[in-house]
């Protein structure tokens, strides 16, 4: 299969156009202009709100003018991540895609199918002339990935439909009817630097090759967190060396909503201890590889000497390492309802650590389907860093989307799927944030579902789109549109 053979052709044509447009989160200006031009070129009513969300209206197919208006919604931004040895500028370069069997992938970068494929499906609906449907509103939101900015900023009345299909889910055959709420915690350790004592040897250790992944949807997959592993080594080694280890820097993770998959630390030890530290690192690496032998089979541990540099003041460095060792990470509780007892209810992810000249900045994200548990988890993370002397701020929370007791749209979506594929879809909740949570606050009567084609390894350069599922989602969506229209 080559790219010219991908089906539905109209969807993949639109996706190819989208991937020519730089659209990092918070920098969607080019995408907004593209959407405006698209709407105008097709003579469709096109609106842009003050936040930058775009809405394009398409009139009903003749004969279906009195049908219920249905909203199709996706987000226009993408997570920007690349392999360390790939030269790529997400602010100006086009995503380079290729076909690998049944999967569409990108060359060394994120693919942008989260949520570019959702946008492409909407544009294909707007451009098509042979789809039966009632009135449609296609909505494209800004900055979903780093703050849900578009959904936060959207005012009541911008959308007018009473049913909404969110096209930002990642497992074909699953229809999502609820999602987790979330919040982000930021901790900063301020410090001064000083010269290391005489007789110290400087070392750099790195960890890479982890799977990483989405910090909500993938948090229960037993994947390693690079930050927690590196912090664990520092804590253990400093204990062994009677507190003599001196830290220079700790850097790992780039995004608040991804499990960090690589990292690097620089530190100094006494000359007399350097060979023991090398031996300890090798033993530690073997132990961690054994712990994750099923889920992480490409871990790469490295240690080398490096140039001398000013070290972080001892008291701050030690408290920073202890805080990282102590802070909760991973899935913490599962749902209490027996029907969904397998699903993660509350989790936390230490997402990034960045060191500059006089501070270390940490980002951790918390999620829960129960808002009181979200508040408690956020306070637990906050307390760990406050006890260690950090300056802590907490970002705006976004709400959970609660399952609707009697959802006409869910019933229509299930029946349409059964009609097409002869089996029931899985109706479930997701332990990740969807914009549906915010929409449910502004539009409490809105009946919503979320589904999409199968994606794997989102938010990483291994992101992949399962090609056959795009056509399945397309057919499913068209059947729902026909059902609503009739």
Segments (PLM) and residue ranges:
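Active-site-adjacent substrate-binding region
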Residues: 225-227, 232-250, 403-446
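Active-site metal-coordination/substrate-binding segment of hydrolases
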Residues: 64-146, 151-162, 202, 317, ...
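Zn-dependent metallopeptidase/amidohydrolase metal-coordination segment
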Residues: 7-11, 345-361, 421-479
């Amino acid at each position: 299969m080559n790219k010219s053979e991908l089906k539905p052709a109209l969807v993949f044509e639109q996706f190819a156009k989208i991937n020519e447009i730089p659209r990092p989160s918070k920098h969607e200006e080019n995408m907004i202009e593209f959407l405006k031009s698209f709407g105008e070129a097709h003579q469709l009513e096109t609106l842009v709100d003050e936040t930058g969300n775009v809405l394009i209206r398409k009139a009903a197919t003749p004969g279906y003018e009195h049908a219920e208006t249905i909203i199709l919604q996706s987000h226009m931004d993408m997570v920007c991540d690349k392999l360390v040895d790939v030269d790529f500028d997400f602010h100006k370069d086009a995503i380079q895609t290729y076909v690998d069997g049944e999967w569409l992938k990108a060359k060394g970068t994120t693919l942008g199918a989260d949520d570019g494929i959702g946008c492409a499906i909407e544009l294909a609906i707007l451009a098509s002339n042979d789809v039966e449907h009632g009135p449609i509103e296609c909505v494209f939101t800004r900055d979903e990935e780093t703050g849900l900015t578009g959904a936060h900023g959207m005012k009541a009345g911008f959308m007018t439909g009473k049913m909404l299909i969110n096209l930002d889910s990642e497992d074909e055959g699953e229809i999502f009817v609820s999602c987790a709420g979330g919040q982000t915690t930021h901790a900063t350790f301020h410090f001064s630097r000083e010269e290391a004592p005489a007789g110290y040897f400087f070392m750099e250790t790195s960890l890479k090759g982890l799977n990483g992944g989405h910090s909500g949807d993938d948090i229960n997959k037993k994947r390693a967190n690079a930050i927690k592993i590196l912090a664990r080594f520092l804590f253990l080694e400093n204990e062994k060396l009677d507190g003599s280890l001196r830290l220079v820097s700790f850097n790992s993770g780039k995004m608040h909503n991804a499990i960090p998959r690589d990292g690097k630390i620089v530190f100094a030890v006494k000359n007399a201890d350097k060979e023991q530290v090398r031996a300890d690192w090798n033993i530690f690496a073997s132990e961690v590889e054994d712990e994750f032998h099923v889920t992480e089979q490409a871990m790469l541990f490295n240690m080398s000497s490096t140039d001398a540099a000013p070290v972080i003041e001892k008291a701050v460095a030690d408290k920073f390492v202890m805080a990282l060792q102590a802070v909760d990470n991973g899935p913490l509780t599962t749902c209490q309802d027996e029907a969904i007892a397998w699903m993660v209810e509350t989790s936390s992810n230490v997402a990034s650590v960045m060191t500059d000249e006089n501070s270390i900045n940490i980002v951790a994200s918390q999620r829960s389907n129960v808002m009181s548990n979200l508040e408690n988890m956020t306070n637990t993370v906050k307390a760990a860093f406050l006890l260690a002397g950090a300056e802590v701020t907490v970002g705006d929370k976004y709400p959970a989307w609660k399952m609707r007791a009697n959802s006409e749209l869910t019933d229509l979506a299930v029946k349409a799927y059964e009609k097409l594929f002869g089996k029931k879809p899985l109706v479930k909740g997701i332990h990740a944030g969807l914009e549906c949570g915010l929409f449910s606050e502004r539009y409490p009567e809105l009946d919503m579902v979320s589904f999409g084609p199968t994606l794997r390894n989102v938010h990483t350069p291994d992101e992949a789109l399962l090609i056959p599922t795009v056509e399945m989602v397309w057919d499913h969506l068209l059947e729902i549109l026909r059902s609503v229209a009739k």
